[in-house]
Amino acid sequence: MKQIFKVGDQKVFARVVGPEDLARFHGELLHPVYSTFALARDFEWSSRLFFIEMKEEDEEGVGTHLSIDHKSPARVGENVIFTATVEKMEGTELICTIEAKVGDRLVATGKTGQKMLKKEKLSRLFGQR
């Protein structure tokens, strides 16, 4: 794993909210706004942007932690900006704080953890041969 980032470094990711991001359960639309579980996907992606640059050919990252405080809605067509900030590195685990905003409006805050493992170890853990 390449140690190329330090505490305070940031990655930014933008996503326009689409119909696939709305709060639905078992095909039923609950709310016509960006769902918390779609935010979770994009929180993980935001911090993974660090690992894309850090990983070696024989490595892959896996999620270890995710927390989200959903503060306000984001509607279809709105551009959500995710800012992932390195909070700390513990061995091969990267901890990031994440902030999601539409303009000046805070949509969500949270934290992610991702750990770098050898692909061979992941294959064993997942029962793949």
Each language-model region and where it sits:
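Catalytic strand-loop segment that frames the active site of acyl-thioester-processing enzymes
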Residues: 1-36
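Flexible, active-site-adjacent loop/turn segments at secondary-structure boundaries
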Residues: 20-23, 31-32, 60, 115, ...
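HotDog/MaoC-like acyl-thioester-processing domains
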Residues: 7, 76, 86-129
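Generic structural detector for well-ordered beta-strands
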Residues: 12-18, 69, 113-115
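Hydrophobic beta-strand-centered segment that forms part of the acyl-chain substrate-binding groove
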Residues: 47-81
